[in-house]
């Protein structure tokens, strides 16, 4: 298994799919990285030389991925909550942010139903 950005990338998959195992790298960004490094999308990661793997590591390191990206997202949410804006309040109350109805739906976000006390 090749290690890129601290993640074990599967050797037996095509490069375009294998790179999506890294948090923050989807299909489009994976295609961009492979085009920049000159690696064909249907090449298996296990068959790449060490030089090509180093080029992939350098290309991936130019983007915010894994821990840095997770930290950035959580800091953005924390900032919204500290500001007290509408989205921050919805995060704080664990409710949907984007205008969905909550009278009957939103069970995933709100959690299981709470019984009515008599």
Curated annotation (Swiss-Prot):
Question: Entry's InterPro entries?
Answer: Rbsml_uS13_C, Ribosomal_uS13, Ribosomal_uS13-like_H2TH, Ribosomal_uS13_bac-type, Ribosomal_uS13_CS
Task: Tell me a GO biological process for this protein.
Answer: translation
Q: Name one Pfam family in it.
A: Ribosomal_S13
For region Disordered, the annotated ranges are 94-118
User: Does the UniProt entry include the keyword Ribosomal protein?
Assistant: yes
| Record's keyword terms, sorted | Ribonucleoprotein, Ribosomal protein, RNA-binding, rRNA-binding, tRNA-binding
Record's keyword annotation contains Ribosomal protein? yes
Matching Gene3D superfamilies: 1.10.8.50, 30s ribosomal protein s13, domain 2
Quote the cellular component terms of the Gene Ontology held in the record. cytosol; small ribosomal subunit
Single Gene Ontology MF annotation:
tRNA binding
The protein's matches in HAMAP family, at most eight in alphabetical order, are given as: Ribosomal_uS13 (MF_01315)
What the protein does comes down to:
Located at the top of the head of the 30S subunit, it contacts several helices of the 16S rRNA. In the 70S ribosome it contacts the 23S rRNA (bridge B1a) and protein L5 of the 50S subunit (bridge B1b), connecting the 2 subunits; these bridges are implicated in subunit movement. Contacts the tRNAs in the A and P-sites.
Assembly, in brief, is: Part of the 30S ribosomal subunit. Forms a loose heterodimer with protein S19. Forms two bridges to the 50S subunit in the 70S ribosome.
Family according to the record? Belongs to the universal ribosomal protein uS13 family.
Spell out the NCBIfam families in the cross-references: uS13_bact
The molecule here is called Small ribosomal subunit protein uS13
Lineage of producing organism: Bacteria, Pseudomonadati, Pseudomonadota, Gammaproteobacteria, Alteromonadales
